[in-house]
Amino acid sequence: MLIDGLTVNTCPVGASDGVTLRNVKSISHPGWGDGLNVFASQNVLYDRVFCRNSDDCTTAYASRKGFFGNCRNVTMRNATLWADVAHPIFIGIHGNAERGDTIENLHYENIDILGQAEPQVDYQGCLAINCGDNNLVRNVTFDNIRIEQIEQGSILQVKVGYNQKYCTAPGRGVENVTFRNIRYKGHQPYLSIVNGYSEERKVKGVTFEGIKINGRLLHDKMEGKPAWYATADYIPMYVGNHVENIGFSIP
């Protein structure tokens, strides 16, 4: 299915296979005004889309709102996202907690994020994975993303957690996440977070390649960084418990 050239309020994709949205604009103002949501679908492509939303701009969830199953093979490219509150990109919080769903193979490329203004710490992160409901989130790539001024919020969050307001179980884990060529220019954002839940529900394998904060390229051997400082401090980012294999490099 191809949807081309429409201007919509919200436009969710649920229980679908093989959907392309091209040249679509999503503009919303009410509460819960998410833009382009994906529920329990696969092989979904967003190309040349614009989102100006009063809640999350785009999401990738598993079972939710009467749609049941895994979510995989979702790509968004050549996009502009602007969230009033909540997240420009949000992944992972909803699924079937009894069965345990999988959200995998997500790719976000060549995206401009114009802002985030979210005062609630647990819902910050322009690039956010909040894994709940016994979901497993894996193989996620954020590539060539430019973030402008953040009014309130952080650059990223990658968490396995148990948000009892919206979930009935913690997530199973997050694996293999790549942040490549991410650029932020503005005043210092709030603290980014990478954090697992337990020894059985970890964050594993988070790679940062070519990250620039206000023009400074961050990597583990960058000039001027004391050897005892964590590279994550320069985002700034807190790396918490139950996190394995996190590293910064030059692509």
Go through each PLM region and give its residues.
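Extracellular/periplasmic carbohydrate-active domains that bind, remodel
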Residues: 1-251
